Structure formats: structure tokens, C-alpha cells
Swiss-Prot record:
UniProt family annotation: Belongs to the serine/threonine dehydratase family.
Gene: sry1
GO BP annotations, alphabetical order: D-serine metabolic process; L-serine metabolic process
Binding site for ATP: 32-33, 52, 87, 119, 277, 311
Active site residues of this protein: 57 (proton acceptor), 82 (proton acceptor)
Recorded GO MF terms: ATP binding; D-serine ammonia-lyase activity; L-serine ammonia-lyase activity; magnesium ion binding; protein homodimerization activity; pyridoxal phosphate binding; serine racemase activity; threonine racemase activity
Sequence positions bearing N6-(pyridoxal phosphate)lysine: 57
Function summary: Catalyzes the synthesis of D-serine from L-serine. Has dehydratase activity towards both L-serine and D-serine.
Protein name as it appears in the record: Serine racemase
Transmembrane feature ranges: none
Subunit structure: Homodimer.
Keyword check for Glycosyltransferase: no
Residues at which Mn(2+) binds: 208, 212, 214
């Protein structure tokens, strides 16, 4: 199937940047002297936890919805998401005046469900361990004439996600390595398009939770591997497989897929809070955790870390901080 896909290019990322700039935040790039000393390197953190609705997903959602025709806008959109894409679609739809229905798992963080509803999205719940959300979405969209905007496997979505890395490179210049959180691959594939444009020799790494290493398996096998829903605190990376669009780009433009443990994620979450004074959700800690694990190989290099988001329940966050 992937052989017939027309894959996005960097030009699509650049176009997305123009399309979303009126509404999307140009998020800050932070540095930490503590991290630079620990790594003996220059490390730059692109903080998408400061994006509208708290995560990079706003970029892709807004880019995709902005390109719908009038009939599609009037009928409305449908998506399925564990949280951040749900909020992103709900907020983007609200901004553009488009009705939105969102299929969310019963165990999605309450903060993400509440925010999605708060932005005006109509939430439909499902059991992620029993139900097939993509099948549900197909049935509802066909019945109601809605346009499905999937969380990651969509050319306009992944092009939008790539705008975060584009901004990072434009602000700090060439990098030797870029670490990107990996769930379904929208952020990683979009970031890889940007990295190859700005710094062709930059090593691009995707990072998954150990329990959900479908991307790593796929990368090594050369074809998409499906797994059961992984049990991990990185709720934004509980995807069961990469997408056709995302994997097609990842296998060509990414250097490797790494994994980290939940314990490493908690260590990074606590570091972000204590030393950098920022709230980062567990999934957003994937990139830094992997860079820390291989810091010996990164000495005297310029490193980019994309923090994917900061949407975490306060009670859950407090629990992680106390561990």
C-alpha cells in the first residue's frame, strides 16, 4: 500500500508553517547549564508543552482542518485519540467553526477528556483493550458523512507536526542529533523532513517506551509491525503500529528508533520540574530520556530535544514527582 502513497516533503512542512502561524504558538527553546554540563554538549529543548492545548498536536490538526473544503467543514470531522490529538482537533475545529466528534479511550487522562469537551468536542468513549477505534471511526464517519482526521497517518497532519522542528532549526541552527518522541510517527516523520532540509547530516532518533516498541521492531524488520496496546505511563505513545505515511518517511529519513523505561521517564519528568521548572507529561520525556542514556556518544555535539507536550493530570503528576 505504501508504494502508492504520495509522501509529503519539506515544502509541505514550510507551507504548513505559513498556514498555522496566525493561531499556533512559536514555542520557546530552552537550554540548561546543568544539562550541558552533564552531557558536555550543547542541548536545546523545543518546548511544545507551551503550544496551544499543551502539545505539538495542535500544529498538525490545524494544518489538516485548514485544508478541508466547504462541504467537509459543514459536515464536520471525526478523530480517535488518547488525548492530545483529541484536544488539538477539538480546539482547531472550534477556531475554524467546524463540528467535531472524538473517539477517546475510557482510561484516557481525565484532564485530556475534560479539555477536549471544554473545547467543544463531542466525546465518544471506547475500551482500548477490547474495541477497534479505527473500525468505530469508519462506521460513524460513513453513517454521518464526517471526514476522518487520524492522529498521525495523514500527510497534512504530519506536515504540520514538522513545523516544530523547523522552528527549532531556524532558531538554533544546524544540529548533530535530534531526539523525537514516537507514538504513531507523526512528529517523528515531520521532524525528519525538517531535519533533512536544515541539517542533512543530523542524526534523527525516534524514542518509544520499552513496552511499546512497535516502531523499533518495524524499523528493523523493514515493514510495519502491530503489537497489543502497551502498558506504559507514556499514554501518548500507546499506539499499536506506525502509519503507512509515517513509516514510509521514517524508514528513509530516520537513523534509529530507541526505547526507554518508565523509570527513566519518571527521572526526566522530575528533572524537568526540579531543574528546568517546566511541566512535561511522561510521553514528552521520551526524547530526553533516550539522549541521557547515550550522552557519552553525544559529547561536544549540538543536540535537539523535542518535548512533545505537558498534558498530565495534576494528581498523577504529583504521584510521579513523589516516586
Amino acid at each position: 500500500m505504501s508504494d502508492n502513497l504520495v509522501l509529503p516533503t519539506y515544502d509541505d512542512v514550510a507551507s504548513a508553517s505559513e498556514r498555522i502561524k496566525k493561531f499556533a504558538n512559536k514555542t520557546p527553546v530552552l537550554t540548561s547549564s546543568t544539562v550541558n554540563k552533564e552531557f558536555v554538549a550543547e542541548v536545546f529543548f523545543k518546548c511544545e508543552n507551551f503550544q496551544k492545548m499543551g502539545a505539538f498536536k495542535f500544529r498538525g490538526a490545524l494544518n489538516a482542518l485548514s485544508q478541508l473544503n466547504e462541504a467537509q467543514r459543514k459536515a464536520g470531522v471525526l478523530t480517535f485519540s488518547s488525548g492530545n490529538h483529541a484536544q488539538a482537533i477539538a480546539l482547531s475545529a472550534k477556531i475554524l467553526g467546524i463540528p467535531a466528534k472524538i473517539i477517546m479511550p475510557l482510561d484516557a487522562p481525565e484532564a485530556k477528556v475534560a479539555a477536549t469537551k471544554g473545547y467543544g468536542g463531542q466525546v465518544i468513549m471506547y475500551d482500548r483493550y477490547k474495541d477497534d477505534r479505527e473500525k468505530m471511526a469508519k462506521e460513524i464517519s460513513e453513517r454521518e458523512g464526517l471526514t476522518i482526521i487520524p492522529p498521525y497517518d495523514h500527510p497534512h497532519v504530519l506536515a504540520g507536526q514538522g513545523t516544530a522542528a523547523k522552528e527549532l532549526f531556524e532558531e538554533v541552527g544546524p544540529l548533530d542529533a535530534l531526539f523525537v518522541c514516537l507514538g504513531g510517527g507523526g512528529l517523528l516523520s515531520g521532524s525528519a523532513l525538517a531535519a533533512r532540509h536544515f541539517a542533512p547530516n543530523c542524526e534523527v532518533y525516534g524514542v518509544e517506551p520499552e513496552a511499546g516498541n512497535d516502531g523499533q521492531q518495524s524499523f528493523r524488520k523493514g515493514s510495519i509491525v502491530h503489537i497489543d496496546t502497551p502498558k506504559t505511563i507514556a499514554d501518548g505513545a500507546q499506539t499499536q503500529h506506525l502509519g503507512n505515511y509515517t513509516f514510509s518517511i521514517i524508514k528513509e529519513k530516520v537513523d534509529d528508533i530507541l526505547t526507554v523505561s518508565d523509570e527513566e521517564l519518571i527521572d526526566c519528568l522530575k528533572f524537568y520540574a526540579a531543574r528546568m521548572k517546566i511541566v512535561v507529561e511522561p510521553t514528552g520525556c521520551l526524547s530526553f530520556a533516550a539522549a541521557r542514556a547515550m550522552k557519552e556518544k553525544l559529547k561536544n555535539k549540538r543536540i535537539g530535544i523535542i518535548i512533545s507536550g505537558g498534558n498530565v493530570d495534576i494528581e498523577r503528576y504529583a504521584h510521579f514527582l513523589s516516586q
